[in-house]
């Protein structure tokens, strides 16, 4: 599994994660243009992104979401308890998939959602692992453990 922090902090949060069969982003807190530029530095075309996992609805986590999704059509996932807050922040309507607290798969990546305290209705951290490999990555809005 390959993990690359594209940006972390109040100016924007986005992390690229690549498994054998899946390429995802955790958050899209940069402009679409900046997401494209930073993905290009990794030799990743934006249309290769399969999905975007959203931690929560603050602008520094979703700034480029509308434009990126309308342009490249990745799936978008957010915890069911954060859906309404996310929809209120978006400029354009998007198709958004929800999940609960159970693990789910995006291709070969196993996603384990974990509630994280923050000043929002629902903030979700993710433990991401590739199949049954031992490599795991925990993402909590810009802080990696």
Show which residues each predicted segment covers.
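Redox-cofactor binding/interface segments in oxidoreductases and associated redox assembly factors
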Residues: 26, 54, 112-114
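Metallo-beta-lactamase
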Residues: 78-133
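A structural micro-motif
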Residues: 1, 22, 74, 93-94, ...
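Active-site metal-binding motif and surrounding structural segment of the metallo-beta-lactamase
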Residues: 32-78
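Active-site metal-binding loops of divalent metal-dependent hydrolases
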Residues: 7-8, 28-30, 57, 81, ...
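Structured catalytic core of nucleotide-sugar glycosyltransferases
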Residues: 4-6, 11-14, 56-61, 87, ...
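Conserved beta-strand hairpin/beta-sheet module of binuclear metal-dependent hydrolase folds
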Residues: 1-42, 124-140
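Residues that form or flank phosphate/diphosphate-binding pockets in enzymes
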Residues: 12, 34, 60-63, 120-123, ...
